[in-house]
Each structure stands twice: as structure tokens, then as C-alpha cells.
Amino acid sequence: MSKDSVAKSKPHLPIMGVGPVYVISIILLSILAMIADKTHLHLPRPTSAPLEIFLFIVGLLFILSGLLIYFLAIKAKITSSIKENTLVTHGIYAVVRNPIYSAWLFICTGTLFLYGNPYLALMLFLIFWLSLTILMKHTEEKWLTKLYGEAYLEYCKKVNRCLPWFNKNNSPI
């Protein structure tokens, strides 16, 4: 029996994974941080028009990047691949292992830049990245390693977990 048919005969991963927990958490944290900053924290903000325009552009680029990543992930038809126990390593999955989660990280960070507070945006970006890293290491990465073994571990060596980047080893996946 081939490795593919063995994987297909195993129960598949949950379709949604831990995604809803992560996405809802970072959306709520973004909203709460903006409310807290407006009402209590009063973190310093840029006062020059060029810097405000720059932050707006950065925020817009983050949001557009997030939307593009999300669209490319949906286009990859990940749901059917999960049901078939197929490890997806092409398309957007060749540049980031968790594109849907990454898309939300970019969208929320972009929203914080549009809000106009670079300190809040950078601080929460790091929190979003760290929480995604911890969450993935302790959940989906364990599930995927158990399901795909060495193939998944090799994929992990070549492709970043959270932030889209070119293949680490410059080799085909």
C-alpha cells in the first residue's frame, strides 16, 4: 500500500483547525487595543502629515497583502485537500505554511496601522506572530507530523510558518 493511500485511509484533520480561535482572538484583541488606546492608554501618535500618510499606506499594503494571501489560500481548495488527507505544498502554500492565519495577521496589523498608532501596530504584530507560532507548534504541526511524517517535516524546513517568504533552501518543494 502506498504512503498516499495510507494517509487517505486515516481520519483527516479538522476542516477549520484551530483557526477560529486564533482569528477571533486577534480580531478582538485589535478592537480592544484600539478602544483602550483611545480611552485609557493614549500612546504617542505621529503628528506630521507625511508620517500619517506613510502609516496609512503601510496599513493599506498590509490589508491588501492579507486579502491576496487569503484569496490564494482559498483558491488552493484546502478543504478538499484536508478531506483527502493530501499535504498541500504548491501555490501560496509554497511560500507560507499557514496562509489563512497569516492573512488575518496581516489584515489585523494593517487595520492597526490605519488606526494610526505604529507602536500599537508593531506591538500587536509581534503578539499575533508569537501566539500563532505557539498555537501552531502545539496543535496543527503535531497533527500534520503524525499524519504525514517526514514529508511534512521536510516541508517545514523549506517553508515559513507564519510570514510568506521564498523557499528557505531554494529547492523545489
Task: Map each language-model feature to its residues.
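Short, amphipathic, aromatic/basic-enriched membrane-interface segments that mark the entry/exit
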Residues: 88-99
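Membrane-anchoring alpha-helices and their flanking helix-loop junctions
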Residues: 1-90, 104-173
